């Protein structure tokens, strides 16, 4: 029997230390030098040790969680020049981290949260973990796992913008108007908002888990339809982007559903949302 509440707090600490408080600069430094890896390990250990403030946890368990994370990351650092691809290293790395936290929750007896946290609803912690999971970690995983599809979509976009710019310039030259001053290479930066796609994906996953919690699976189809309508023009004109869009959308929804089922059916099996009792209309029975 696993210790569900302990796993939730350890998993939250893992998400915070491995994703939210690991900026891109530190991630790059971690790949280039061992000092960056040590700095990341110290930040991660800080969040793991903070679990003691929330759950009555022995110190040795928190130290084991911190040291095991450092060992796994060190092995990944040594394998960075191997034949394993970045997506494969990322999957193995996160799987081992998750497995370690799960084993620690199994090997420890049931532990209670601190008394000052009793004012919060029991479902607060799995919901907090779920939101943390489907936000930045999934965005990072999309960038790593589907990097080649994203690059193909970007190259396709640049080619389309260049062709459009050339057509516009040719039309202006024919009309004897030399008003086109913006280089074609700058057009993609003017036409796209940086980070908008990541926010769309995050909101999509949050809405998905809300629909799943309420049993409204049909509403997920409407969500996908609305998202597809917003991107219809680019999907219809760019096969590379269409593939990347479809893969990213299906992956995003799949992760949201699996994350919800894992946290609420396996780790912390409680009813997250109480659905109202359906109203049944009945005809009055005739009087005797």
Residue locations for each model-derived region?
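Transmembrane helix interruption/hinge and helix-loop junction motifs
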Residues: 1-4, 51-61, 212-219
């Amino acid at each position: 029997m696993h210790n569900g509440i302990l796993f939730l707090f350890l998993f939250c600490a893992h998400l915070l230390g491995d994703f939210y408080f690991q900026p891109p600069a530190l991630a790059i430094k971690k790949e280039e030098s061992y000092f960056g890896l040590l700095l990341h390990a110290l930040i991660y250990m800080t969040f793991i040790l903070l679990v003691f403030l929330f759950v009555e946890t022995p110190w040795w368990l928190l130290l084991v969680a911190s040291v095991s994370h450092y060992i796994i990351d060190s092995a990944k650092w040594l394998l960075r020049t191997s034949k394993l691809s970045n997506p494969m290293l990322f999957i193995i790395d996160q799987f081992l981290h998750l497995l370690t936290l799960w084993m620690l929750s199994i090997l420890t007896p049931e532990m209670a949260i601190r008394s000052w946290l009793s004012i919060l609803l029991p479902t607060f912690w799995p919901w907090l973990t779920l939101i943390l999971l489907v936000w930045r970690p999934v965005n990072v995983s999309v960038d790593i796992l589907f990097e080649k599809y994203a690059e193909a979509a970007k190259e396709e976009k640049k080619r389309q913008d260049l062709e459009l710019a050339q057509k516009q310039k040719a039309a202006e030259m024919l009309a004897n108007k030399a008003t086109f001053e913006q280089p074609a290479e700058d057009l993609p930066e003017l036409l796209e908002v940086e980070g908008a796609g990541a926010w769309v994906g995050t909101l999509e996953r949050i809405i998905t888990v809300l629909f799943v919690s309420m049993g409204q699976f049909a509403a997920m189809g409407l969500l996908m339809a609305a998202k597809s309508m917003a991107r219809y023009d680019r999907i219809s004109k760019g096969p590379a982007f269409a593939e990347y869009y479809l893969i990213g959308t299906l992956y995003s929804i799949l992760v949201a559903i699996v994350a919800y089922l894992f946290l609420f059916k396996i780790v912390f099996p409680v009813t997250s949302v109480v659905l109202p009792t359906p109203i049944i209309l009945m005809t009055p029975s005739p009087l005797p």
